[in-house]
Amino acid sequence: MSSSSTNNTDPHIAVLAFPFGTHAAPLLNIIHRLATASPKTHFSFFNTSTSNTKIFPTSKHGGELLNVKAYDVWNGVSEGYVQVGKPQEDIELFVKAAPESFRMGIKAAVAELGREVSCLVSDAFFWFAAEMAEEMGVPWVPFWTAGPHSLSAHVHTELIRETIGVGGSFLIY
């Protein structure tokens, strides 16, 4: 979608996806629903190339909707890097690079569209997205892709630790 076919005052929503597991697909699903309901709103969907290729219906990441565009961000793995085999290494590398990768992606989308971001939507555990939204002066909408039980566990982590214990002092049944 070129900037010539858009109105610079229409909303521009930046969406930050977590590319691992099943996080990105449900987020894209809700974005597609919002894009259908609000055709003048542009949604810039930031994700890794690998994940975008898997979840978008076309190989060019354009999707079916003209107001949703995928942008590829860096996965955090430098060229020539040899992974050491830690189970979560790819996730750790991505999360370390994500804040700057997303900032660069947003900057490119704003330049391409000629529209500033008016709202930031992200996977809920991207803590840095709140800071990014504050820096941009826009609302942040964290989206929880998992079920309510895991959210409850995260919200009540301290209570669980106080009740059950951590380290060497575990509650034994």
What residues fall within each predicted segment?
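Glycosyltransferase specificity loop/lid
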Residues: 1-173
